[in-house]
Amino acid sequence: MKTLIEQLPKAELHIHIEGSLEPELMFKLAQRNHQRLSFSSVEEAKQAYQFNDLQSFLNIYYQGANVLYGEEDFYDLTWNYLEKAKKQNICHTEIFFDPQTHTNRGVPFAAIITGITEALKAGKDQLGISSYLILCFLRDLTVESAFETLEQAIKYGEKIKAIGLDSAEKNNPPSKFKEVFDKARAEGFLTVAHAGEEGSSDYIWQAINLLKVSRIDHGIRCIDDPKLVEYLAEKQIPLTVCPLSNVKLKVFNCLEDHNLKILLDQGLCVTINSDDPAYFGGYLNENFLAISQALRLTEIDLQKMINNSFRASFLNTSEKEQLYIQ
């Protein structure tokens, strides 16, 4: 199974670029930008990557993001991920970025998006990896902040494929951002949203009915609502599931408890992704291998989820066929 996972071409649809910041690069960028870290070494940073829930992870995640300042930093961050993606036979990726994490520290929006998109262009030219960029609003910030960020995004509309929603779900339902998403769709952006990770299955309904999303990021709480499971299967609304993340953040106690196989067997369009791989102990192939071993998935299951990742992507039909043939 390991060899098959490594050999098959794959698409990744749920990867936060800030979450691919490995400790080694964190220290390099901290030195470049004269930033003091609370960790004295790379090893100490790695040991600190222990979380009890989403919020405790976010506290460390944002500390790491503080080393990102200039265009070069965002280029290096993105390029590092793309090099790993190439080694894992990822031929298409749709990357999240969180501009508010940086603009709130005084980092220019232009530096963020230019650094990332220049790396993505180089990834296409030098590595053969196609990509789209998804801007995520931080749901624990205000709607006004999201609107301000959207105005910045509109200026770079040709570089941003979709608008998303992430960060702490608790007390931050999708409905809070309905008007912002209405505006985003009117401007031509596609929409996705994190829902049903820590939040209830109702958050998934809200993302579908109010935010009009093309796919649900995480979505594993759908299992609590049989009608929702039936609807997701009927409409083939994709779920971008992140197994190692779910265990690391205590959504499930262990991979053996994960409901991915149940959802897959009920006909849902399930995909596997790495989420924040630097923090959760594995990139895409490691997620595939770990969940395959834990749930005793078959090669047919594996093939189905890889097919789903291309089907669920924002590529057009001919692009999907071309990449998968390769």
Curated annotation (Swiss-Prot):
GO terms classed as biological process: adenine catabolic process; hypoxanthine salvage; nucleotide metabolic process
Superkingdom field: Bacteria
The protein's required cofactors: Zn(2+)
Gene Ontology CC terms, in alphabetical order: cytosol
Pfam families: A_deaminase (PF00962)
Site (Important for catalytic activity): 218
Reaction(s) catalysed (UniProt annotation): adenine + H2O + H(+) = hypoxanthine + NH4(+)
Binding site for substrate: 276
SUPFAM superfamilies: Metallo-dependent hydrolases
Any one GO molecular function term: zinc ion binding
Keywords noted in UniProt: Hydrolase, Metal-binding, Nucleotide metabolism, Zinc
Record's function text: Catalyzes the hydrolytic deamination of adenine to hypoxanthine. Plays an important role in the purine salvage pathway and in nitrogen catabolism.
Annotated InterPro entries: A_deaminase_dom, ADE, Ado/ade_deaminase, Metal_Hydrolase
Protein name per Swiss-Prot or TrEMBL: Adenine deaminase
Residues that span the membrane, as ranges: none
Active site: 197
Binding residues annotated for Zn(2+), in chain numbering: 14, 16, 194, 275
Organism per entry: Crocosphaera subtropica (strain ATCC 51142 / BH68) (Cyanothece sp. (strain ATCC 51142))
Family indicated by similarity: Belongs to the metallo-dependent hydrolases superfamily. Adenosine and AMP deaminases family. Adenine deaminase type 2 subfamily.
Cofactor: how and how many bound: Binds 1 zinc ion per subunit.
NCBIfam families the record matches: aden_deam, PRK09358.1-6
Entry EC no(s): 3.5.4.2
